[in-house]
């Protein structure tokens, strides 16, 4: 529909998850220039877009390659100042890169939908290591609790991989319990 649009802020991925071909297909992570992103968003608002969906293979890495630090929170604050948008949604927030600044920005900006799309993939530390990802059930639970503490009505969306090579029935059951 004409009232919704996707705004791609970067291309590629540097995460190198063992199951994923995106880095080979799309190449290394490359942030767009923040001014170009804001200008494109202004054009979308002028055309009547009300819901803006901010996307990249890993939105939380935005800016690290160009500016030497994460810039997603700053970008979101700038997008919120654009007249016309009612809702701004952020997709594909890699769990290792979710900062307190990002959580605070999502919590504090009325236009940002209180919705976190975080591809967790699994909760078992051994499975995550074989996936070439970080964390474990404890660290992921701590992250989710931190987000819920600052954004009480947050809605989470995630993806999980079951049947990953070497996953035991016990690890599968742990994931099923975690995701419930």
Task: Name each region found by the language model.
Residues 22-25, 60:
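Detector for the c-type heme attachment site
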Residues 46-169:
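Conserved SAM/AdoMet-binding glycine-rich loop
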Residues 150, 170-180:
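C-terminal, non-catalytic macromolecule-binding modules
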Residues 26-53, 74:
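Conserved alpha-helical substructure of the radical SAM core
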């Amino acid at each position: 529909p004409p009232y919704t649009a996707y705004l791609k802020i970067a291309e590629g991925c540097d995460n190198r998850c063992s199951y994923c071909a995106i880095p080979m297909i799309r190449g290394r992570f490359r942030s767009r220039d923040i001014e170009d992103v804001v200008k494109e968003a202004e054009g979308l608002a002028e055309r009547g877009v009300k819901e803006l969906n901010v996307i990249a293979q890993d939105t939380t890495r935005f800016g690290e390659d160009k500016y030497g630090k994460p810039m997603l929170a700053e970008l979101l604050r700038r997008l919120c100042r654009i007249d016309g948008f009612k809702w701004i949604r952020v997709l594909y927030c890699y769990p290792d890169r979710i900062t307190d600044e990002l959580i605070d920005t999502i919590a504090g900006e009325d236009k940002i939908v209180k919705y976190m799309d975080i591809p967790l993939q699994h909760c078992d530390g051994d499975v995550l290591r074989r996936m070439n990802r970080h964390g474990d059930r404890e660290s992921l639970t701590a992250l989710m609790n931190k987000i819920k503490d600052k954004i009480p009505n947050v809605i989470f969306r995630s993806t999980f991989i079951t049947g990953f090579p070497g996953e035991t029935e016990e690890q599968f059951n742990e994931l099923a319990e975690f995701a419930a």
